[in-house]
Amino acid sequence: MKLAYWMYAGPAHIGTLRIATSFKNVHAIMHAPLGDDYFNVMRSMLERERDFTPVTASVVDRKVLGRGSQDKVVTNIVRKDQEEAPDLIVLTPTCTSSILQEDLQNFVARAQEQSKADVLLADVNHYRYNEFTAADRTLTQIVSYYIEKLAGNLPARSEKPTANILGISTLGFHNHHDCRELKQLLADLGVEVNVVAPEGCSVHDIQKMPSAWFNVVPYRELGRGAAEYLQRQTGQPLIDITPMGILQTARFIRAVQQILNTQGARVEYEEYIRSQTLFVSQAAWFSRSIDCQNLQGKRAVVYGDLTHAAAMTRILAREMGVRVVWAGTFCKYDAEWFKAEVADLCDEVLISDDHAEVGDRIAAAEPAAIFGTQMERHIGKRLNIPCGVISSPIHIQNFPVGYRPFLGYEGTNQIADLVYNSFTLGMEDHLLEVFGGHDTKEVITKTMTAQSDLEWDEAATRELAKIPGFVRSKVKRNTEKFARESGRDKITLEVMYAAKEAAGA
C-alpha cells in the first residue's frame, strides 16, 4: 500500500464493483468505511446512464469495530434482497476493511439462508490485486459459478456461427462504442453475437455461453480468465486479438475464418478485408496521403494500459510511419507480454506506474505528440506538447455521447483523426506565435519534477522564445547538451551562440 495523489489503476474493490454493476439485476454490497464509497459518485458522473448505481455501502463505523460486522452485513444483504429482488448479490470488502480480517464467507453463508438471490463473496486478495486483475478475477468467478450450476448439462452448440464477447464493462475506455462496432463486424462476417458479458448481461445468460462457437476477448485486461475457463470446461476456442488498426483488424478476421472453417463452416473473408481496407475504411487511404506523410519521422511517446498502448504503438510505427521514442504501460503484472508486443516497434520500453517518472521521461524525450491517459494529458499541457487520450484512466470528455469506437474499421478512422489532430503542425504553431495566437505559451526550460541542473537567464529565455516552435525544442536540447559538456551551469546568450557554432549551424 502506498500513498499517492494519482493512481493509474484503482484498488481491487473498484474492479469488483465495475463487474457487478455491469451485469443486469446484480447488486453489490461494499463492506467499507466512509471514504471508500466513492464508486457510486464516480460511476454516476462518468457513465451516461439513467439508472442508479446498484451499490450499497455497509459502513464500518465505531459500533461495528466494537461488536463485529456480521449482523450489519447480513442485515444489509437481506434488506437489499427484499427491496431490489436481484438475481445475484456480490459482497466485497475494501483494502481498509480487509484489515479487520473478518470471516466474510461465513457472513455470506448466513445471508444466503435468508435470501432468494444468490450471494457471492468476491474472491479477491485486496493487497495483491489492482482494479484490472480484480475485475478479471471477479468476472471469472461469476461465470464459473453459473456454469457449474449446470452440473455438466451444457446447452448444445448453435446451428449458425455465434460468438460471446467477454470483457465489455462499465467505466471502460470507449467500451460501449467498441462493443457496437464488434457486433457490426461479426454480423458482416455472418456471426451472431450470443452473449456480451458483463455489460448488460443477466447472470442467467451466462448459462447460454457454452452454445457459442467461440469467445472474443477484445481487451488484454478483462475477460481472458473467463474465456480460458470456458475453453477448459466446454472446449470453446478464444480469439484474444484486439482488432485495433487496419493490420490487427485483418488478423482478427482471419482468426475468425480459421475457427469457423475448423468447426465445419466454409467461409472466405479475404475479399471482405480487401474491400473494407481499400474502400470503406478511410485510414488506409489516409496513411498514403500527403497529410499523413507529413507525420513520417515525427517523434511520439505512447503510454497506457496493455491493450491500448500496445495497439497504438503498432499503429503509429507500422501504419503511419511515426517514430515511437518509447512505449510504456502501468500494468506491471503483465510486463513480459507488453515487452514482447512492442519491443520491435519503439526505441525503449517503460514499465512504471509512477506518474512523476512518466512525466520526466516525456520531458526528456521532447516528443512532437503524446498518446496516453488523462494524466499524460495534464503533463502535455504543462510541457506544451499535444496529447491524444488513448487509454484509461480518463475523465468525462472521454465518455463521448457520439459514436467513437477504437475497434474495427470505423475505429481505424477515429484513430487516424486522433493521431493527425494530436500533432501540432509546424507552420501553424509558428504563425500562432508570430501573430500572438491563443496557443502561445511560455518557454519551458525544466523537467516535470524541476530537477534540471541548468538555469536559463532572462535574455537567453527571450531569445529561445523567438525561435519557431517546431525547432525550439531541438535548439534547447542542443544548447543544454553543449552547456553540460563545457561545464556551464547557467545558459546565457553567449552560451547559446557558442552552442550554435559548435553544432555547425
Swiss-Prot record:
Biochemical pathway: Porphyrin-containing compound metabolism; chlorophyll biosynthesis (light-independent)
Enzyme class: oxidoreductase
Keyword Aminoacyl-tRNA synthetase in annotation: no
Coiled-coil zones: none
Active site: 291
Domain of life where this protein originates: Bacteria
EC number annotated for this UniProt entry: 1.3.7.7
GO MF, one example: metal ion binding
Record function comment: Component of the dark-operative protochlorophyllide reductase (DPOR) that uses Mg-ATP and reduced ferredoxin to reduce ring D of protochlorophyllide (Pchlide) to form chlorophyllide a (Chlide). This reaction is light-independent. The NB-protein (ChlN-ChlB) is the catalytic component of the complex.
Name under which the protein is recorded: Light-independent protochlorophyllide reductase subunit B
Organism: Gloeobacter violaceus (strain ATCC 29082 / PCC 7421)
Name of the gene this protein is made from: chlB
